[in-house]
Amino acid sequence: YRSCTSWGRISPPNAAPLTMAAPHDLVGELDNSQCWALNTATEHPLANCIAMDKRTGAGVCQSDCDEELLITLTFLQKVRLSGLSIKAPKEGGPSSVKLYANRADAADFDSTKALPVTQELTLSPANTLSAAVVPLLTAKFPSVYKLTILIEANHDDAEETVIEQLAVHGAVNEIVGKRNDNAPKWSEDSGVEKFEKARG
C-alpha cells in the first residue's frame, strides 16, 4: 500500500455497495421526541404539521409573538435531502426560509442567525398553497441527521406565520449486497489503513 498519509480512503474489497432509494417524504424517519420549535403558540405546536397522525388539516403550527419560527428536525438515521415542502394558507404562509444542516449549536434565534446558511429559499404563495416540493441542493445535504429551519418572514406581512404541513423529502442510504464474511476485514491502525485476516 501507499505509505503517504495525504491520500483519501480506499474502499475495502468486497464491500457492500451503497445505493440511494427514490426520494420520498421522510416523515417516518423523524425522531419526534427530538423535534422542537421556538416561538410557537401553545395551542398550535410543531407536532400539528409534522406528526404523521396529525397531518389531517385539523390543526396548524403557528408562531406566537411575531412572524419568526425556529424549527429543528432530528432524524432517526442519516438521510440525503432533496426537497422541502410547506403547505400553508395564503396569508401568513412562510416566504423566507433558511436551512442549516447538522448544527447542534443552532439553539436559539440569535445563535442560529450568526451561523452560515446551508441554503436559503424564497417561497411564493403558489408554493405554499399547493405544498409544492422545492428542490434542495443535494450536494449540501448528503448526510443529514439534524435540520434547522429558520422562518424569518411570511406572505402579506401577517403578524403570525402559519404552517399546515411541513415535509422534507429525500432518502436513506441503503446497503445492498452482502459482504463476504471470509474476505479480509478493513481496519485502521494509527491512521494507516491496512488489511487484517478474518478470524477463522
Q: Where on the chain are the PLM-derived regions?
A:
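Extended, solvent-exposed segments with strong compositional bias
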Residues: 111-139
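Detector for Asparagine
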Residues: 14, 32, 39, 48, ...
